[in-house]
């Protein structure tokens, strides 16, 4: 079983390449998609100014109000059904779901978050409607893969305590699903060719090397490396970080082009 995460820019600019590539894969595929740029577009169209916050680690993320949560769900559902309909129209047996469906992804809402304000000072603010995955009901996917070849998953989770959907990070969703399924491979596709150090792609890292390197590279990729190391330590065979904008992006990753995090 292969888990593939495609970032928002890949969804917006290279989706057809991803879909054509999936047609040539004979394994079961769990496709987790992002879509931040598209969410921002729809937010602005509806007259809502998107708000982004920066963590003390330098990671910039969307601040999700109740109003923007509704737009997020709408946009992600549109992306999900667009991907699923294209796959089905090309003869693939696919289904599109969110992490809310069946309680696939159970999360906890972030009650408070620490941000860096416009003066460069740390400040604690109300957490909005973003969450952290706490549980994956892997039996749902295990049942679905008996019926479908491809499962397209939107990164929306269910907050059981407050009974509301939550915006969750797409990478986090993909890592959580991969660990729960003990997937053979997790592929992370974005607009970079892999982990870059001094402009060159690092081809292979062990989990311990990935953790060490995470201390020396920029925000965003450092988090990917930490989660990749944890995934391999928890039963995922390998994690591959590669380009989603080149031709044959998934096949290229399976041929180990990019950065591979694995034991040994």
From Swiss-Prot:
GO molecular function: acetylglutamate kinase activity; ATP binding; N2-acetyl-L-aminoadipate kinase activity
Keyword Metal-binding: no
Associated pathway: Amino-acid biosynthesis; L-lysine biosynthesis via AAA pathway; L-lysine from L-alpha-aminoadipate (Thermus route): step 2/5; Amino-acid biosynthesis; L-arginine biosynthesis
Site for Transition state stabilizer, residues: 5, 224
InterPro entries, alphabetized: AceGlu_kinase-like_sf (IPR036393), AcgluKinase_fam (IPR004662), Asp/Glu/Uridylate_kinase (IPR001048), LysZ (IPR037529)
Lineage top rank: taxon: Archaea
One Pfam family hit: AA_kinase
Keyword terms: Amino-acid biosynthesis, Arginine biosynthesis, ATP-binding, Cytoplasm, Kinase, Lysine biosynthesis, Nucleotide-binding, Transferase
One of the record's GO cellular component terms: cytoplasm
Cellular localisation: Cytoplasm
GO biological process terms held by the UniProt record: arginine biosynthetic process via ornithine; L-arginine biosynthetic process; lysine biosynthetic process via aminoadipic acid
The EC number(s) this enzyme carries: 2.7.2.17, 2.7.2.19
Binding-site positions, substrate: 35-36, 62, 167
Catalytic activity, reaction form: [amino-group carrier protein]-C-terminal-N-(1,4-dicarboxybutan-1-yl)-L-glutamine + ATP = [amino-group carrier protein]-C-terminal-N-(1-carboxy-5-phosphooxy-5-oxopentan-1-yl)-L-glutamine + ADP; [amino-group carrier protein]-C-terminal-gamma-(L-glutamyl)-L-glutamate + ATP = [amino-group carrier protein]-C-terminal-gamma-(5-phospho-L-glutamyl)-L-glutamate + ADP
Protein purpose: Involved in both the arginine and lysine biosynthetic pathways. Phosphorylates the LysW-bound precursors glutamate (for arginine biosynthesis), respectively alpha-aminoadipate (for lysine biosynthesis).
Similarity field: Belongs to the acetylglutamate kinase family. LysZ subfamily.
Protein name: [LysW]-aminoadipate/[LysW]-glutamate kinase
Gene: lysZ
């Amino acid at each position: 079983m292969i888990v593939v995460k495609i970032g928002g820019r890949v969804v917006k600019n290279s989706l057809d390449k991803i879909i054509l590539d999936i047609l040539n894969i004979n394994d079961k595929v769990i496709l987790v998609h992002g879509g931040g740029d598209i969410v921002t577009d729809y937010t602005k169209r509806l007259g809502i100014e998107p708000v982004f916050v920066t963590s003390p680690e330098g990671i910039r993320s969307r601040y999700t109000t109740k109003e923007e949560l509704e737009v997020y769900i709408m946009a992600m559902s549109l992306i999900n059904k667009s991907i699923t309909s294209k796959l089905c129209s090309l003869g693939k047996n696919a289904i599109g779901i969110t992490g809310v469906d069946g309680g696939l992804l159970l999360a906890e809402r972030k009650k408070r978050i620490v941000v860096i304000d416009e003066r460069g000072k740390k400040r604690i603010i109300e957490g909005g409607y973003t969450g952290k995955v706490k549980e994956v009901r892997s039996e749902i996917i295990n049942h679905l893969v008996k019926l479908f070849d491809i499962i397209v998953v939107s990164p929306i989770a269910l907050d059981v305590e407050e009974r509301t959907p939550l915006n969750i990070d797409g990478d986090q969703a993909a890592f959580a699903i991969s660990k729960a399924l003990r997937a053979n491979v997790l592929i992370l596709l974005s607009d970079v060719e892999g982990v870059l150090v001094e402009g060159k792609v690092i081809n292979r890292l062990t989990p311990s090397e990935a953790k060490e390197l995470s201390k020396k590279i920029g925000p965003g990729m450092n988090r990917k490396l930490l989660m990749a190391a944890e995934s391999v330590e928890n039963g995922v065979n390998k994690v591959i970080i590669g380009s989603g904008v080149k031709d044959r992006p998934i096949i290229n990753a399976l041929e180990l082009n990019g950065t591979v995090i694995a034991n040994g």
